[in-house]
């Protein structure tokens, strides 16, 4: 029995032009009408996640900042230890000094990680972090839009487990959908992990279902079948 559907946005329920795929939205809203909450899991900020959920009509829990922040109803939970947050800020300052990297947002908008522009090779960022002794606690995740400096102790999958504990949901009853490497832990933690055809090879290896079509086109087909199963 499906108790929750949680999905990434870009490359998952969007089209090639990054506009939301209307069939995906329609099917997800129909699932909600049948009592199955729909949530968002993103590398973006909680502010963005809440706005997107409101615009799309999703009423379920939210995973933001790659699992660093979780929102269940009106409760906001930071999953990252304070010492890791301080270390990430320190690492960013060193990267800015040594490589000239820049934040993608003003300071303070992200609570648990730092997102930087992809102006230098990710290997250079990792080399500096390793040389400074940060690589044991901080990792760099390339979402395709930015490099995210984040704690190794959290990811979207661990964020999902926090949600399941709060809501009393068995993770095996969760459907998770995503395409990027930062979605891999989410799909692994869920009972059913679904990846569109454009997903990275790492995500495809982890997914229980790999769709034939890319982006929202493939996900819409899956959601239609899921809706049919719920109605059966």
UniProtKB/Swiss-Prot annotation:
Binding site for substrate: 156
Residues involved in Mg(2+) binding: 8, 10, 179, 183
Keyword Magnesium part of the UniProt annotation: yes
GO cellular component terms, A-Z: cytosol
EC nos: 3.1.3.18
Top-level taxon in the UniProt lineage: Archaea
HAMAP family linked: GPH_hydrolase_arch
Protein's name according to its UniProt entry: Phosphoglycolate phosphatase
Originating species: Methanopyrus kandleri (strain AV19 / DSM 6324 / JCM 9639 / NBRC 100938)
